């Protein structure tokens, strides 16, 4: 059945490629994706969806296609961009600038492939709408904003996504990455890490740089905390478990001869299980609190945890059924297993709040010959990957593979006509 549906892809391939390039040329930051949302909703209406709604979770788009009795299946794609200056040199490269959520003027680029995600889901929605004689059930298409801030999925849920629209029995999604174009990679169980961000403020007492004895130096406190945090993964997390603690930002003071009264650290945590997640978070707070006490700080540290996303769990049974359909459609030679990925995705929120399975897979966007050449020369780490200013998937076969994968996955769970 999937071959019958995807046989129509050549009829819309050029249109989709142009749409993808337009999205790439005109990226929008998280929760500012108004132009993109308007284009996506227009496409769904033109495809004949029964319901199309914008503004779900600020800028999210939802489409409902009812086609008789049968399962409710959800296809999801994100569509926000990043504050990155594009360096791909493509004729459709972004030259856009924007204002980020902290009020800074920044360059904007689709450096994570969300434009490809959105174009592929648009294509899959068009093909499934054209082929209603092939399946039965309800298709729920969700274009999610603000994945890069890890707040988009929760925002849509909190805005009544599953009260206003049919509750799906399964959630399906995908992510393009630095694999050979046309290849599909998958894992089962926890496939992407939980993410937590912490803004930590250490309070001290300021003084002139010539009189350190009059201070409680928050810079020294911060340095000790940064060093001590490295012991969490090395000495508190079991070797068989995976965790990452990264200090990506340390800010203190304005002048070399002034000891400031506070230091701020931006900390990122990645884990795969709730138990390790709690252990690492508790250890960070314990270490910072102990350092402040040891330094004689009058105020305890401030902890502001933000941007939390749960570990993404691809349901083992549902994933195996979907991958079997991929193998039948694409051929086993285009399917590969993947290790766990320490990056994070908030798509898991949807299935988690409903208690239904999520199936998530990856597909390649890099030129195959380029990947093989890098592999031969042991240069794989030099290839542009997600969030790189040089990352841009080759349009084909990336686009066609992404569209077909979504169609195949949806038809695996929708009822036969």
Q: In which residue ranges do the predicted regions lie?
A:
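General structural feature for long, well-ordered alpha-helical segments within catalytic domains
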Residues: 12-19, 32-40, 71, 108, ...
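Histidine/acidic-residue-rich, glycine-tolerant segments that coordinate divalent metal ions
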Residues: 61, 82-84, 89-109, 115-116, ...
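Metal-dependent amide/peptide-bond hydrolase catalytic core
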Residues: 220-417
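Non-cysteine beta-strand/loop elements that form the S-adenosyl-L-methionine
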Residues: 74-76, 85, 198-200, 361-364
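Acidic/His- and Gly-rich active-site-bordering loop/insert found
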Residues: 2-110, 115, 119-123, 127-136
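Hydrophobic/aromatic beta-strand patches that form the interior of the parallel beta-sheet core
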Residues: 73, 142, 170-172, 357-361
């Amino acid at each position: 059945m999937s071959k019958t549906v995807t046989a129509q892809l050549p009829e819309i391939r050029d249109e989709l490629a142009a749409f993808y390039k337009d999205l790439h040329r005109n990226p929008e930051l998280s929760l500012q994706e108004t132009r993109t949302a308007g284009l996506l909703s227009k496409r769904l209406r033109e495809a004949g969806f029964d319901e199309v709604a914008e503004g779900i979770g600020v800028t999210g788009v939802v489409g409902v296609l009812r086609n008789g009795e049968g399962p409710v299946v959800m296809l999801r794609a994100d569509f926000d961009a990043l504050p990155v200056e594009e360096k791909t040199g493509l004729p459709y490269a972004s030259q856009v600038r924007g204002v980020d959520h902290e009020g800074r003027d920044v360059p904007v680029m689709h450096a994570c492939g969300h434009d490809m995600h959105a174009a592929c889901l648009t294509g899959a929605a068009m093909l499934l709408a054209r082929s209603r004689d092939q399946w039965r059930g309800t298709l729920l298409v969700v274009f999610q904003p603000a994945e890069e801030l890890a707040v988009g999925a929760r925002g849509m849920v909190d805005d009544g996504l599953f009260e206003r629209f049919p509750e799906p029995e399964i959630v399906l999604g995908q992510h393009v990455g630095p694999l050979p174009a046309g290849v599909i990679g998958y894992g089962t169980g926890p496939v992407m890490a939980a993410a937590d961000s912490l803004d930590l403020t250490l309070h001290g007492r300021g003084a002139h740089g010539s009189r350190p004895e009059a201070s409680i130096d928050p810079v020294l406190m911060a340095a000790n905390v940064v060093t001590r945090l490295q012991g969490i993964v090395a000495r508190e997390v079991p070797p068989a478990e995976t965790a990452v603690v990264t200090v990506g930002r340390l800010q203190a003071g304005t002048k070399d001869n002034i000891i400031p009264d506070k230091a701020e650290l931006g900390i990122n945590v990645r884990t795969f299980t709730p138990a390790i997640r709690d252990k690492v978070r508790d250890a960070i707070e314990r270490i910072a609190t102990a350092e402040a006490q040891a330094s004689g700080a009058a105020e305890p540290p401030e902890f502001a945890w933000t941007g939390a996303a749960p570990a993404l769990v691809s349901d083992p049974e549902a994933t195996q059924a979907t991958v079997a359909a991929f193998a039948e459609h694409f051929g086993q030679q285009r399917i590969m297993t993947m290790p766990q990925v320490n990056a994070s995705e908030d798509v898991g929120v949807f299935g988690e709040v409903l208690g239904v399975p999520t199936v998530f897979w990856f597909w390649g966007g890099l030129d195959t010959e380029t990947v093989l050449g890098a592999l031969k020369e042991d240069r794989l780490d030099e290839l542009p990957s997600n969030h790189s200013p040089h990352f841009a998937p080759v349009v084909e076969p990336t686009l066609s593979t992404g569209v077909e994968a979504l169609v195949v996955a949806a038809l695996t769970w929708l009822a036969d006509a």
